[in-house]
């Protein structure tokens, strides 16, 4: 509730809230102090809108590093004075833009703005980076990747800086762009998130079942920062109805559902945090069930489990110009009508996964693959399999796919392993592994198993 507290402290309309870190740091420090004195163990920097794209609104885009480092400094000063055991989470909020194909921003441009902010926060000395209030899984993927890269570049590990991914869900239990909690969790866990959670939009009672859904697919720590109830518009003012006394007990079901880190978002005053802290510390949470690892792929909206314990899955392989002269020519002409029709026909026929191959002779696969991912991710809920041997085409597909894709495929050859494995790890993809080496399939079962194990 930094924004609400800043408004109460005199934030004027049109003034950048994050500029307080530089021009009025004593105001920010006082806000931090109030939360620390009321039970906060982690405080969040005043940097929710301190990425370059957001600071452009105030013509401050050239001061990203200065503002973020100043924010960490004032938070650390408050901790040193009021609660030395507390830790600092560097806040990175949404850019306010949508990525292609929902909007006009490229993945790389969103990545770059988060990378710049993450580098500054890490340089300042945060204990966590908290990517929060995100409503689009592609924006989260870009922010997470930027944070991981910034951490690596600084020579840090997750023991030094943990990365928290917090989505914001609507009353229907999905993000505004349609992603449910289990799908969102699967995607960011595969990419390397350290903590996964929810903040904003909803109150504790509405968020509890969503935390349960997250806990059903991961063993990672879970964070939760609800609003002080569902927002209400009273006399043209947004009001959050839960009192401090009411909110504390309502957080206990969230803890029992699996949340490790709990706090508050909009409308939560220092008194709310004190109520939450007292309730949680006096409560013995239920033991969280251990989740057995599973192979899961997703689209933006749908989760699909693979394995010997599931039904046989059908992969539709019509989206492939090999041996299809008409499709190949249409792709040369820039037409994706047949691609989209093939996708819909295969889904209607029962395909569980759609294989996407853009290998047209004499053409660069990369722009074709990018266009195919944009078109298909907007058209069908069915998860996609990326079918290419071209590393550039594979990367553009994995980067722009709003889910956890399946890569088709990797084999036992060194070149295949060194090209495909790093991309799968970076973008959190699942792998279809073929027990083939030097173009040959071993005749004996034990040789195939040995090759698979080596992969």
What are these regions (language model features)?
Residues 1-455:
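Domain-level signal for soluble alpha/beta catalytic cores
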């Amino acid at each position: 509730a930094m924004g609400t507290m800043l408004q109460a402290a005199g934030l004027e309309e049109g003034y950048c809230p994050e500029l307080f870190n530089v021009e009025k740091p004593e105001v920010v420090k006082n806000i931090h102090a109030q939360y620390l004195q009321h039970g906060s163990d982690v405080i969040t920097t005043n940097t929710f809108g301190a990425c370059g794209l957001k600071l452009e609104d105030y013509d401050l885009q050239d001061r990203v590093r200065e503002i973020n480092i100043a924010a960490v400094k004032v938070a650390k000063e408050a901790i040193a004075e009021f609660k030395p055991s507390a830790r600092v989470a560097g806040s990175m909020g949404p850019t306010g833009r949508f990525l292609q194909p929902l909007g006009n921003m490229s993945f790389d441009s969103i990545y770059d703005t988060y990378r710049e902010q993450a580098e500054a926060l890490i340089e300042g000395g945060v204990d966590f980076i908290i990517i929060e209030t995100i409503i689009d899984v592609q924006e989260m993927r870009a922010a997470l990747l930027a944070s991981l890269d910034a951490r690596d570049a600084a020579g840090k590990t997750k023991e030094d800086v943990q990365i928290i991914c917090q989505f914001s869900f609507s009353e229907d239990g999905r993000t505004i762009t349609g992603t449910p909690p289990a799908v969102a969790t699967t995607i960011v866990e595969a990419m390397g998130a350290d903590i996964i959670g929810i903040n904003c939009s909803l109150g504790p009672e509405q968020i509890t079942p969503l935390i349960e859904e997250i806990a059903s697919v991961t063993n990672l720590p879970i964070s939760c920062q609800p609003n002080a109830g569902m927002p209400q518009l009273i006399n043209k003012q947004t009001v959050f109805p839960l009192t401090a006394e009411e909110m504390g007990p309502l957080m206990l079901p969230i803890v029992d559902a699996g949340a490790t880190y709990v706090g508050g978002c909009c409308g939560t005053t220092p008194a709310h945090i004190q109520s939450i802290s007292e309730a949680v510390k006096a409560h013995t949470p239920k033991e969280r069930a251990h989740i057995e690892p599973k192979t899961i792929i997703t689209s933006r909206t749908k989760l699909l489990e693979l394995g010997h314990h599931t039904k046989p899955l059908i992969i539709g392989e019509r989206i492939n110009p090999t041996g299809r002269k008409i499709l190949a020519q249409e792709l040369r002409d820039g037409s994706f009508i047949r691609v989209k029709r093939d996708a819909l026909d295969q889904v209607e026929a029962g395909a569980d996964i759609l294989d996407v191959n853009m290998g047209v002779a004499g053409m660069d696969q990369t722009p074709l693959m990018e266009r195919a991912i944009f078109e298909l991710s907007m058209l069908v809920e069915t998860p996609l399999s990326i079918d290419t041997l071209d590393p550039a085409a594979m990367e553009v597909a994995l980067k722009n796919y709003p889910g956890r894709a399946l890569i088709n495929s990797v084999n036992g050859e060194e070149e295949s392993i060194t090209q495909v494995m790093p991309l799968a790890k970076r973008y959190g993809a699942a792998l279809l592994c073929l027990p083939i080496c030097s173009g040959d399939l071993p005749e004996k079962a034990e040789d195939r198993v040995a090759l698979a194990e080596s992969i």
